[in-house]
């Protein structure tokens, strides 16, 4: 037994080399070996290998070991970055069992740390020799490198950060390779001689991006200087360059967030001392920084920040940038290299075939500003110009429309994160806008197409948000857009008035600048408005089918409708966040009002939602929970859940100026990877027809079933309004104020109208379903846990479809910003049918008319309609027919909000093109050719019109009486094309389409 232990001990020593007294087992086939005290990473010596040209170094004679779970670890020092290739082969006898390619692309110490199962060959084997082969980029060059702290059979370091020395082998590594993968991207922009304009603009940028000077504190500076003097010793060469010094632990385990903060702030304190000309600070600063860089606290070192790490990098990176003015050019180059290493700078160099799939809004938010600083502050002008151009391209690329659910922008103007439209995460827009503003007036500004795409995204934020009424920056979204942060940061606009104004003033493209100024004036009336542009109103209906939502707005109100699909979740539930939020977007219809907080919209203002009935989300159809624990995924406060549909994708909107449609085939899944809730098998066809100031809601085919308790009703929720000082109006039912009296059931055999305290009116016709009205105090949990509750007074109402229903339906009308007298008048008109007519309400089609408008929500192919001129369609889509009696013209708008997702290897899924063919009664032709619309020659008294739908976008076309003398094309191509024109008014450019005028971003001019 003792012999076995001794043998084990000898084997362990034999596989470890520190080179303090010898270099046994190491033999240079070419060049020379020597123990050296010049550089070391352990003890006071290392092994120096000096050679010329291609050379080999062999390690043999140690006790063989099994290459399975353990790793090879060593420190390798390079006096300069050469780009040489060092091949390391692990042998069993003469057979090569593992091969590593180590690139000599750094200066100083770096780790060779690699598991034996991180190679092309991973079979079980014994290792009894190593062979190093150095292939220099210059065959005649003499090279020196140093080895230290070699452990051939080391314990694996699972937390190591592979440096850029592994750019050729990182695909084999089983740790986080994000940084080295970016470093492996080919730098495809050459360093060229800058133009006079580029040099001038570079100086402008350097002035704008100059880091903030570190704050001086005599105590902190003295403490930092004393620490360096007491803990750091360095030896310098005759020319002043660093030779060696105190060993610094640069393993990933040592470089914690706290240690990074300590190191960077210590450097800041010393830099502040240099600024104040404090004696000894310059020497301490240089000694400390030079030693850090030499020891591997540098580019390619063991430092990495996750792209969603928002604390540590915000301290470390600005601190490192702030010391640049106090660095020598060599120090600047290396510090900038470190900053690039940790701020994802390599993302600027994704290849043409990979960059689109790698857009990440977290990287934009966290790192874009630092990327731009690192580029501009490079001391070499030509390199700085090249680097700024790389960041400029990165910015332009990040405005591209990414297919599927990837970050960041979509064709309809929505911003994506976590695979869906997520306004709360579009704080990336702040960083992007700041970078755009930094580039103002320079030749490095992003191109017009990129600027326009980003401007459209900003415009979309303010279209979705409540109007200004109070604080200029207090804007809120519907709670259905709150993600996992309901009634808190998730519903607050994460963009500022100043930034929107900056985007307008910085814009170098005249037409686009005009539109941005108009958007700013419309979003912030009376707040430093631009006086050189025509007025613009945000009122109207908008569609965002990558959300999918409809937005209707007028005056001081905005209404938002939303539902989930199989690709876009309607609610995101995280550990300790939004635990009861699964119903946020179940066909929601939320009416909100401008104000300093959410109280004006009847929402809780406590940032937690405690006191809000999570069952009753306005507009939704839900199965009410009677036990809050059951409403959490798996009944816990930690399990994750994303609320998708159960495979259906027909949900979204059609907008045509002041009218529009929202529709959803709502199917609720209760699983996410695995079952998370007791299934209720909830289904419903839900639609909302928007006619300027009223919204007609129609539901059909509502069903629910399962083993859940019979005390859980299925309901379509009208509203919930939290009573507060800002929302203290009475609840009115059929003209009578309701006291806080608990619950009442309205007679379903008659029409009923209600006026919520927020001033939103509701009218319901006679129905077989009961209408429940509740007014009083309610105690409910916060969104974080069922253990914390709150009590609020609420007025709420919902349609009770019964416990488990089949084939239930509903109709109701929503009138925003009204009062009791107006609602009484509306109720009379709604009741006698003079305001609107529901023409069809079944599993295939919801159709509603008002005035000269007929809206169709086709849930499937349909035929046999006897109203209007539409007789059939071949697939699901939305359609609005507006008849102009004076010209006998039918003005159609159509879209398919179903993106028909198709699996894609690169993007997960992509939207696909679809077509639908309408059959119109009568003989019709297109008033003008329109892209994606093709009229067939009328036959047998009917006309077929084929529509092509892409990306959820609408098509607009006019049908006029067929004129045989006008001629008719033989192919679809003959009847397609785009006929729009530009119009200039007061020096401002607009687009005219279908007789309507739009800004260059597509916003209708009122």
Describe the residue ranges of each PLM region:
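Short carbohydrate-recognition loop motifs
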Residues: 35-54
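Aromatic-lined, polymer-binding surfaces characteristic
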Residues: 204-478
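Extracellular beta-strand ligand-recognition surfaces/modules
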Residues: 19, 72-75, 111-151
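C-terminal outer-membrane/trafficking sorting elements
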Residues: 965-1006
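Extracellular carbohydrate recognition and processing domains
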Residues: 83, 93-126
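Secreted extracellular polysaccharide-interacting domains
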Residues: 28, 49-71, 91-101
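Extracellular carbohydrate-recognition regions
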Residues: 13-30
